[in-house]
Amino acid sequence: MGERVRWKQPELTSRGIDQTRLVIDADNESPGPEDAFHFLVLGDSGTGRHRFHSPPRQIAERLLTHKSQAAFLLHTGDVVYLVGAADQYRDNFLRPFREWLRDGEQWESMSHKNLVFNQPFLPVPGNHDYYDLSLPVALIAGLTLPLRRHLQWFHDVDAGWRGSGQGEVYSNAFIDGLNQLHSTKLSEHLETHYDAHWDGSRCLRYKPGQNTRLPNRYYRFRHAGVDVFAIDSNTLITPLGETQDGPSLQRDLRELEAKQRST
């Protein structure tokens, strides 16, 4: 994933860009630290293929009644079942959550790549978004797919020829893939979209309806004085010891813990 976002490459570090933060542009003034606000949260929003109804759509319909009052929606992972493949996005994400997508009424012809949301929709990848199929499983799933569709089983194993490409499909849908930009376009892109400022660093500006890419597979944003951390726990490993950002992150953690104790 680091290659996809050009992690800490000179073009970004020389501009002081923090690739783990984003600032959300809001239509109205953000509420203050003492003000209440609402947000939506969901996870594991999929299943295998159902013939007569769509569990993801039923979830989305329950959330729709609260959409207009919510500041943002957090998705805690397993965005697209069963294996996060590109051909599963239409029925398992685009169709169910079309009201959150710009031009969502055109979901049938919409690509899963470079999605744009009309309201902050902030996911992290789950294990299903990283799934890949071994060759034997892919062959069995692919060869039996026409038969399974013909039989119209009530509940089917939603798998075909492909998996997620080790999260590549998720990345194409939600993450700002800087590796896809030619070097001549990269500078313009960074100046246009990484123009927000946070504690002395530049970061990605999230603009609903325009640019709703995420800077990384894990990230942080702030709303009404509340810091929200989105962590991809699929790839957690033993810490490598001291890092350049370690002291500042430890300081931020101590400050947050102190605030919690004082409230």
List the model feature ranges, each with a label:
Residues 45, 73-76, 230-241:
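Short glycine/proline-rich turn/loop motifs
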Residues 46, 78-83, 242-245:
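Second-shell loop/turn segments in exported
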Residues 235-254, 258-263:
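Active-site-proximal segments of metal-dependent phosphoesterases and phosphodiesterases across multiple
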Residues 47, 80-81, 129, 227:
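Short active-site segment of divalent metal-dependent hydrolases/proteases
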Residues 218-220, 228-230, 255:
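Conserved hydrophobic/aromatic beta-strand scaffold that supports enzyme active sites
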Residues 1-72, 87, 91, 95-125, ...:
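Acidic, histidine-bearing metal-coordination/catalytic regions of metal-dependent phosphoesterases
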